[in-house]
Amino acid sequence: MTTNELSPEEVRDSKIYIEWGLTEQEYDLIVKELKRLPNFTETGIFSGMWSEHVSYKKSKPILRKFWSSNERVLQGPGEGAGILDIGDNQAVVFKAESHNHPSFVEPYEGAATGVGGILRDIFSMGAQPIAVLDSLRFGELDNAHTKHIVDGVIAGIAGYGNAIGIPTVGGEIGFDGVYAGNPLVNVMAVGLMDQNAMQVGQAKGIGNSIIYVGAKTGRDGINGASFASAEFSSAEKSDRSAVQVGDPFLEKLVMDATLQAIREHSDIIVGIQDMGAAGLLSSSSEMAAKAGMGIHLNLDMVPQRETGMTPYELMLSESQERMVLVVKKGEEQAIIDLFQSADLDAVIIGQVTDDGRYRLNFKNEVVADVPVDFLTHAPKQDLPMIEPARLANFTDEQFEPDMGNVKETILTLLAQPTIASKASLFRHFDSQVRADTAIKPGGDAALIRIRDTQKALAMTTDVNARYLYLNPRVGAKMAVAEAARNIVSTGAKPIGITDGLNFGSPDNPEVYYELDQAVAGINDVAKQLDTPIISGNVSLYNETDGQAIYPTPMIGMVGLLEDITKATRTAFQKAGDNIYLVGRTKDSFNGSEIQKMQTGHIAGQLFDFNDEDELAAQQVILDVTDQRLLNSAHDLSEGGLIVGLLESAFAGNLGFDISVDLADKYLFSETPSRFVVSVSPENRTTFESLAGDRVIKLGVVTADDTINITTTTSDIQLSLIETKKIYQESIAWKLNAE
C-alpha cells in the first residue's frame, strides 16, 4: 500500500467511494467480482471508469438507438471519432466534445482544453485536423458573472485554436437564463485523411509495447471524469483541481509527431488513443478491452512533472497533450526516436498481455489487478422516465406578437443577443490560418476547400433548445433539419452527424424522458436525410441547485460539395436580383425569439414540423444550386423571415424592396423548412420552373441604403446602415456595459 493511502478496510468503512461517484451497489459488485476488498487505487480506477462521463452507463441504453451506418461510414461510434468516405480514397473525420463543467469553474482553461482534447481525437485516427467549430450557451448578458464566463471561454478557444494553427471556422452562440449556472462549451473538430491512414484505439498482440508520448503527467484534472458526472451546488466550493491546463504549442508538437509516425511507421503501429477523460486509465484499459487483451503497466516509468505522485493520481490525472501508442515488440525505438526528436517524452510503460487483466505495478508492488472486461463495462442503468409535467400544461394556442410598432419591434429584435451578430466574439478566432476557408464565420455553414480537388466540405453546429423545452422530440427533429438547411444553403449535400447531448440529471425521470425523446427525434430526421450519427458526446448533470438547463442536443453536421465553383453564400450579391421565399409561412410563435423578447419566457405547444416539407425545400435548393441559378441562399431560423432578409442584406451591404402578402406578425414567425434566396433576372424563369409552387417572389435587391418592406398591414422603411449598426454592435455594447 502506498504511504498515506487508505487501506481496503478504511476505504470500505469511510465510504470514500461514494464521494468518488460509486454507489453502494456498485462497490458491493466490485467486492463480489474481485472476491476481496478493492484497495485505494483499484477503487479509484473503478470510480473513473464507471463514471457516467466515461462509461455512459445511464445514457447508453438510449444511445444504442442511434442510426449510425450507411455506405459512407468507415468508422461509427466507439472510436475517437467517426469517419466517412468522401470518394477518391479520402475520408472526413469528425466529432464533438463538451467541456461544460470545467468551463464554468475556469472558463479560459476549460474552453482551451476542450479544443485540445477534440483535436487529439481527430489526429489519433490518422487525420489532419482542418477546422474547429463551437456551439456555446451562456446566461443572459446582464449578469456580470456571465460576462466573465463569456470573456474567458472566447479567449480560451481563441488562445488554443489560433496557437495550434487550426482555423475556428464557425459555430453558434446562444444566451438564456437557464445557462447562467451551467454554460455549455461544445467543440466540434473536423479532419481529413487518406483512407489507408486510418487508425484505431486497440491494444492487441501479446508482448507489444505500450508507449506513453507527449507531456508529462501532473495533478491537474484528477477526478475530472467524476467531476463531469455530478451536478453543481452554488454553495459548494469550486473544484479547480478537476480542471486541466493546456499548452497548445506542445499539442502542435504532439499532433505533428503523431501524424508523422502514422505516415512513416504505420506498419508497426498497432493502435493509438488520446488520453482524455480519466486519462491514462481510460485510454489504456479501453484499448485492451477492444482487443480482448490484458495490459500490464509499470507506473514508475510514467513521466511526471510533479514529485510524489501516487498510482491513483497517475492513473486519473487528465493532464493534456498526452497519447498512448501500442507498437510492435522490437520496433519501439523508431517511434521513441521520432517523438524525442520533437522534444517530447516517449517511453515504454507496459506491455499487452493475454490474461485479460489490468495490472498496475508501482515501486515493486502490484497496486491494481482487476479484469479488463469488468473494469470497462460499468453496470448499465435503465432509468425510469416520465413526460415532464410542463408539457401537459402547455396549450395549443399560438402566442400572438404585439405589433404596436413594427419598426421598433424589428430594431429591438436585432439587438437581442441570440439574434445579434456574433462577429465581435468570432473576430478573436483565426478562421483563415490554413488558407482553405472558402466561407468564413457568419454564414449559414463554413466551407473548407479540399486541396488539389474541386471538392469542399461544409460544416455547421445547430440547436434551438427552446423548441426542445416545448417538445423534446419535435425540437430535436428541427435541430437536425436546421443543421441540414445550413449545409444545403452552401450548395453541399449533408452526409453525416456528430452530436453533443447536453441535459440535466438523468436521475430525474423527466430529464431522462427528454434525452430519450431527443434521440428519437434526431434519428427520425437523420434517417430521412441519409446522415448517420457516427460520433458524439453526452454531457449530463448540467444542473445547479436543482435547476436544469434546457435539453440541448447540439447537432454537428458535415456536408460534401462536389464542385466548389457551385458554392452559394448568405449575402445578397447584386442590385436587381430577385428575392424569393422558399417554403410556406404559418403561425409559428411558441418558443420563438419574439415570444421570449415580448414576454420574458417561452411557453405553449411547439408549432408543427413537417418532414416532407423539409425534405422538399432542401431538394429545391440543391437542385437549383446544381444548375448555378442562385446568387445567395440563407435558411430561416431564429427571428424568422425579417432576420433572414436583413442578414443577407447586411452581409452584402445591399438593401432590398419587398412586398409580402402576409400580416406584420408573420415577419417574425419561425416556421421551419424555409429559405430566402436571390436569383439574377436572367435566371428567373428557369428558377421558377424548377422550384415550382414552393417559392414566392418577394421583391428585389437594391443598391441604396433604404430597406422597404410592405405587408398587408404596414409599409416599413429602415436604414441599412443604422439597422446594421444595431445588429453588429449590440453584443459588444452589452458585454461592455456596467
Curated annotation (Swiss-Prot):
Magnesium listed as a keyword: yes
Cellular localisation: Cytoplasm
Coiled-coil regions, chain positions: none
GO cellular component: cytoplasm
Residues the entry annotates as binding Mg(2+) 1: 97, 537
UniProt-listed Pfam families: AIRS, AIRS_C, FGAR-AT_linker
EC number(s) stated in the UniProt entry for this protein: 6.3.5.3
PANTHER family: PHOSPHORIBOSYLFORMYLGLYCINAMIDINE SYNTHASE SUBUNIT PURL (PTHR43555:SF1)
Family indicated by similarity: Belongs to the FGAMS family.
Entry protein name: Phosphoribosylformylglycinamidine synthase subunit PurL
Organism the protein comes from: Leuconostoc mesenteroides subsp. mesenteroides (strain ATCC 8293 / DSM 20343 / BCRC 11652 / CCM 1803 / JCM 6124 / NCDO 523 / NBRC 100496 / NCIMB 8023 / NCTC 12954 / NRRL B-1118 / 37Y)
